[in-house]
């Protein structure tokens, strides 16, 4: 059951990104170019997600293992260190993306026709980096404790709000791609509030506590080592996407890049059930590994 909830959570998470692009593609007169511009932003957004996975997917399994051993105190040190680390990484990434965003986008496949839309979308999205990092990274610690439905709600809240705000900001307010980016970061902000409210609250097994916020290398370095493999996988996917965009822009133009954006969304959506099964099974396997119960 937990694996099925994990699959549903992944599907809902990707679904609102796809709907986001559907709205952008229907912007009058400039929809195709706007969609292509936003598509060029995807490699950078994937890199941001990779950093969230580096910390979240590295720390959450270790916390589950310690819970299985009955060492909740050490598990809370991990969640506190990972929370601090996510904030610091978010600040650094935000500065880098805001200062070098246009340069990155031009290198990643934006053309003279699409750079305006790419920059308009990404500059706003970059401001909300901290929401993305904390939502994606810290939500893993909710599912790691067995609260998979709570983790699903954090995704569902963001998805519903984003779907509601997209047409308002894009069409009613006439903000175009800027409206799509604004809707995204506001929805991620709401999800972030939900995640942190739970992790700072009393209903959770592991809480974020003030005394565990100070970074301790022997606590967070093993988490980064464990999350490095997923980070490399997602970063590699970003590099592949950049190569595709550059080649398509050279030989097929902006329309080809836009078509690849749509195709990539469909391919990612098709892979989500399997990713969700793995995400749902991870807390169970980690906990039982820590409890020395391999048969279960």
Question: In which residue ranges do the predicted regions lie?
Answer:
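Short runs within selected transmembrane alpha-helices of multi-pass transporters and secretion channels
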Residues: 56, 125-143, 154-159, 180-195, ...
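Small-residue-rich hydrophobic transmembrane alpha-helices
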Residues: 35-95, 132-151, 259-296
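Helix-terminus/linker motif at the lipid-water interface of multi-pass membrane proteins
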Residues: 15-35, 105-112, 168-174, 235-265, ...
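Single conserved hydrophobic/aromatic residue that forms the stacking wall/gate
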Residues: 1-6, 11
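Hydrophobic residues within alpha-helical transmembrane segments
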Residues: 41-44, 84-88, 127, 153-160, ...
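Hydrophobic faces of transmembrane alpha-helices in multi-pass small-molecule transporters and flippases
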Residues: 7-8, 122, 126, 149-156, ...
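Short alpha-helical transmembrane segments in multi-pass integral membrane proteins
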Residues: 7, 63-130, 172-227, 285-296
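Generic alpha-helical transmembrane segments of integral inner-membrane proteins
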Residues: 11, 15, 19, 51, ...
């Amino acid at each position: 059951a937990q694996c099925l909830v994990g699959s549903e959570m992944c599907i809902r998470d990707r679904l609102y990104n796809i709907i986001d692009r559907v709205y952008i593609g229907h912007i009058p007169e400039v929809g195709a170019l706007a969609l292509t511009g936003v598509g060029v932003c995807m490699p950078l957004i994937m890199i941001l997600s990779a950093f969230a996975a580096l910390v979240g997917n590295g720390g959450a399994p270790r916390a589950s293992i310690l819970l299985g051993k009955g060492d909740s105190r050490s598990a809370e040190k991990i969640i506190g260190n990972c929370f601090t680390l996510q904030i610091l990484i978010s600040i650094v990434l935000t500065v880098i993306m805001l200062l070098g965003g246009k340069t990155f986008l031009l290198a990643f496949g934006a053309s003279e026709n699409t750079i305006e839309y790419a920059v308009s979308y990404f500059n706003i999205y970059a401001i909300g980096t901290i929401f993305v990092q904390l939502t994606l990274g810290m939500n893993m610690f909710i599912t790691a404790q067995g609260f998979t439905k709570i983790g699903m709600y954090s995704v569902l809240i963001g998805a519903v709000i984003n779907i509601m705000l997209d047409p308002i900001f894009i069409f009613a307010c006439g903000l175009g791609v800027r409206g799509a980016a604004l809707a995204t970061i506001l929805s991620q902000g709401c999800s972030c509030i939900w995640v942190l409210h739970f992790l700072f609250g009393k209903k959770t097994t592991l809480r974020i506590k003030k005394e565990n916020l100070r970074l301790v290398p022997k606590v967070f370095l093993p988490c980064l080592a464990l999350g490095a493999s997923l980070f490399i996988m997602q970063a590699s996917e970003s590099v592949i996407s950049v190569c595709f965009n550059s080649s398509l822009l050279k030989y097929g133009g902006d329309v080809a890049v836009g078509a690849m954006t749509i195709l990539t969304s469909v391919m990612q959506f098709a892979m989500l059930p399997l990713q969700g099964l793995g995400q749902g099974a991870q807390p169970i396997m980690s906990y039982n590994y820590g409890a020395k119960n391999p048969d279960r």
